[in-house]
């Protein structure tokens, strides 16, 4: 049975993309992920995540969807919330992967509602959506690692290309470096990798 795990990185940051990743692997290879030490990306150092991401790519099929800050803003202007935006990415990955079963770290407060939505959209597919799925299912833990590594690489790329603008920090609103970076611009001057629809930034309009 081909099992697809899906997770994301970058829901909360004010800078950079939302990254949704899928990792598809035959069920018989779950033990390989376990032996490799695959677990929830938040419990791993950046170096360990990158090491594991390379190994995951060797034994599994990997899918990523990156939704830029400006695309997030455009979609929010059209009335989409962040959960709906993430679901759009999930629905791009599933048909490309064509799994027998999909396990999702639920974006919906009611996981069963997400399960029903995916089933009705894709027909006869076995769906599991749970909060904290990245701590219980190896393919989802692997997807969380891929998503975090890809998101970190995107942030590094943004920083390198925009070094003259200053230190962007981690991109999270709680990061003092990120806050200082945002404070150096008026709302209209903000670069396109900043999510203007975030409350942190909206305050600048006032």
From Swiss-Prot:
It is found in: Cytoplasm. Pfam families: RNase_HII. It comes from the Archaea. A divalent metal cation binds at residues 7-8, 105. NCBIfam families: ribonuclease HII (TIGR00729). PANTHER family: RIBONUCLEASE, RIBONUCLEASE H2 SUBUNIT A. This is Ribonuclease HII. It comes from Methanothermobacter thermautotrophicus (strain ATCC 29096 / DSM 1053 / JCM 10044 / NBRC 100330 / Delta H) (Methanobacterium thermoautotrophicum).
